[in-house]
């Protein structure tokens, strides 16, 4: 009787754990921007960027990675941000060819 009760408890625990894992959406972003930098960053300092467009985040953003390995959130609507992304895209295309 005790063995079957222990087995039942283990089975229920395993079921609850698997339900929690399945309930987690796979597309939860690992990073969101809550504050945007207002300061223009020199293109020479930038290494790469990442667009944050998930509806799970409070706002759309671009995260620039600098050569000093800093991450800076900026507004993707800013003209200088769009120019910097274009520059980095062209730079990465030249490196690939």
Curated annotation (Swiss-Prot):
Compartments it resides in: Secreted
A Gene Ontology biological process term: inflammatory response
Primary location recorded for the protein, binned into one broad class: secreted
GO CC list: extracellular space
Keywords: Chemotaxis, Cytokine, Disulfide bond, Glycoprotein, Inflammatory response, Secreted, Signal
SMART domains associated with the record: SCY (SM00199)
GO molecular function, one term: CCR3 chemokine receptor binding
SUPFAM superfamilies: Interleukin 8-like chemokines (SSF54117)
Xref: InterPro entries: Chemokine_b/g/d, Chemokine_CC_CS, Chemokine_IL8-like_dom, Interleukin_8-like_sf
Pfam families registered for this protein in UniProt: IL8
Sites carrying sugar chains: 94
Residues in the signal sequence: 1-23
Disulphide linkage map: 32-57, 33-73
Function of the protein: In response to the presence of allergens, this protein directly promotes the accumulation of eosinophils (a prominent feature of allergic inflammatory reactions), but not lymphocytes, macrophages or neutrophils. Attracts eosinophils in vitro but is not responsible for eosinophilia in the ovary. Binds to CCR3.
Assigned protein family: Belongs to the intercrine beta (chemokine CC) family.
Name this polypeptide is given: Eotaxin
Gene: CCL11
